[in-house]
């Protein structure tokens, strides 16, 4: 059984690393979050006039 040279192992490692990074970037940039429509649910503030 022939052995792989160290340079071949390194190129294999680089190839798998680049594939993993590409896959992660594609997953990251393909995600589109849904916008939350909260225009109807506005926070009600109570106006308090402080009299010192």
From Swiss-Prot:
Keyword Metal-binding: no
Gene Ontology CC: mitochondrial membrane; proton-transporting ATP synthase complex
Membrane-traversing stretches: 7-23
Short name of any one Pfam family annotated for the protein: ATP-synt_8
Compartments where found: Mitochondrion membrane
Bilayer topology annotation: Single-pass membrane protein
Function recorded in the entry: Mitochondrial membrane ATP synthase (F(1)F(0) ATP synthase or Complex V) produces ATP from ADP in the presence of a proton gradient across the membrane which is generated by electron transport complexes of the respiratory chain. F-type ATPases consist of two structural domains, F(1) - containing the extramembraneous catalytic core and F(0) - containing the membrane proton channel, linked together by a central stalk and a peripheral stalk. During catalysis, ATP synthesis in the catalytic domain of F(1) is coupled via a rotary mechanism of the central stalk subunits to proton translocation.
Entry protein name: ATP synthase protein 8
Species in which this protein is naturally found: Locusta migratoria
The organism's taxonomic lineage, starting at the top: Eukaryota, Metazoa, Ecdysozoa, Arthropoda, Hexapoda
